[in-house]
């Protein structure tokens, strides 16, 4: 199937699931500890070459923490030689001035550093790592020193949302060019911890108001910092156009080579091919996994006849699966969905007390335990 299928313009290379932090909102799969057979340097080179030949132009290096890969500089250099615009998505842990210099030499275009909170104590508690804040702060200074655009990301949730002023002030102190204040998206570990992470409507309204006030202040000062506030669809009545549509632009390759239309799709009971077994072009155009939710033939009638279907593409398939057990159901976020009460229930639960210490932190021990108790689909290498 190639007719009407666009190009995979954005390649996400999940280099590893390994990470020194234990963030309870991580989007990695709950059973990540079971997936250890990472692609080799040469295998990643081959992925980049194929993707570039297909028309991919932007390449994101993520994880886990991509810096645990000692060949990261080699991977960046190869991608740069192929003409990719490259972006490193990192916690900053494992970054040093020497590595920043080496990555600059290799041709890396962009570094995005994530923080957990503006307060060092809260930051390190959420990261599950001592001195994480100190390391991140210093690395941000060095990123700026080496003339990278300063892009900071804060995952916002009920345990840090009331610090929104301090978060923005920290970003200004670090001379950030762009700040992404992204309300937690509930996939992977974040979905497991949803009751302890989802902010209340009141918290969200306050945070958005304060962000808008800062935007006006910065605009009046002709300040270059750009504040991006990403609202959670749990407080919307229409679903987001997830990944701009299934298999339309994004191509994700997991650490073990599984090819996915988005990084959260691994949890679905759908067979996805592996780049070790199939060419990327065959995966993109011919595989059952990538064609599964293209178009609108899969949609239930209410979605198929909806005038918004060409804008939201039916919403998020992973969210539909997590909440209803069937990825083909209408996204519960949609106010027209017969499952919308699940979202309303989640909003009500946000009013409950949920101490930080009750969160399940992302680490190998918890991953192995959850793998034994959760109903997680087991994928095998499949034919196209």
Curated annotation (Swiss-Prot):
Which ranges carry the Radical SAM core domain? 5-220
Signal peptide span per the entry? none
Q: Does the keyword RNA-binding feature in the UniProt annotation?
A: no
Enzyme superclass (EC): oxidoreductase
Residues binding [4Fe-4S] cluster: 19, 23, 26
Q: List the GO molecular function terms.
A: 4 iron, 4 sulfur cluster binding; cyclase activity; iron ion binding; oxidoreductase activity; S-adenosyl-L-methionine binding
Give the matching CDD domains.
Answer: Radical_SAM, SPASM_PqqE
**Which Gene3D superfamilies does the record associate with it?**
Aldolase class I
Q: Share an example GO biological-process annotation for this protein.
A: pyrroloquinoline quinone biosynthetic process
Sorted alphabetically, which keywords does the UniProt record give? Answer: 4Fe-4S, Iron, Iron-sulfur, Metal-binding, Oxidoreductase, PQQ biosynthesis, S-adenosyl-L-methionine
Q: Does the keyword S-adenosyl-L-methionine apply?
A: yes
Catalysed reaction, written as an equation: [PQQ precursor protein] + S-adenosyl-L-methionine = E-Y cross-linked-[PQQ precursor protein] + 5'-deoxyadenosine + L-methionine + H(+)
Cofactor(s) listed:
[4Fe-4S] cluster
**What superkingdom does the record give?**
Bacteria
EC number(s) recorded for this UniProt protein: 1.21.98.4
Free-text remark on how the cofactor is bound: Binds 1 [4Fe-4S] cluster. The cluster is coordinated with 3 cysteines and an exchangeable S-adenosyl-L-methionine.
Pathway listed for it is: Cofactor biosynthesis; pyrroloquinoline quinone biosynthesis
Q: Per its UniProt record, what SMART domains does this chain match?
A: Elp3
Which HAMAP family does the entry mention?
PqqE
The function of this protein is: Catalyzes the cross-linking of a glutamate residue and a tyrosine residue in the PqqA protein as part of the biosynthesis of pyrroloquinoline quinone (PQQ).
How does this polypeptide assemble, per the annotation?
A: Interacts with PqqD. The interaction is necessary for activity of PqqE.
What does the sequence similarity comment in the record state about its family?
Belongs to the radical SAM superfamily. PqqE family.
Q: What is this protein called?
A: PqqA peptide cyclase
Q: Which organism is it from?
A: Acinetobacter calcoaceticus
Query: What's the name of its gene?
Result: pqqE
